[in-house]
Amino acid sequence: MKRTYQPNVRKRAKTHGFRARMKTKAGRNVLARRRAKGRHRLTVSDE
């Protein structure tokens, strides 16, 4: 059976990348939370 995770770099960046996060209010909240927590990688784009 086909598994649910079929890795694709472009899809990953477009969905969870920095610019995708910045587009919505909720996404900006995600970044703010991760900054407050002290995450070194805010998004998958920062790898």
Curated annotation (Swiss-Prot):
Question: Keywords in UniProt for this one?
Answer: Ribonucleoprotein, Ribosomal protein
Its cellular-component GO annotations read: ribonucleoprotein complex; ribosome
Query: Per the record's keyword annotation, is Metal-binding included, yes or no?
Result: no
**What are the protein's GO molecular function terms?**
structural constituent of ribosome
Question: Single Gene Ontology BP term?
Answer: translation
Q: Which InterPro entries does this entry report, sorted A to Z?
A: Ribosomal_bL34 (IPR000271), Ribosomal_bL34_CS (IPR020939)
Q: List the disulfide bonds.
A: none
Task: Give the highest taxon in the source lineage.
Answer: Bacteria
Instruction: Output the Pfam families linked to this UniProt entry.
Output: Ribosomal_L34
Q: Where is this region: Disordered?
A: 22-47
Has keyword Ion transport? no
Which family does the entry's similarity section mention?
Belongs to the bacterial ribosomal protein bL34 family.
Protein known as:
Large ribosomal subunit protein bL34
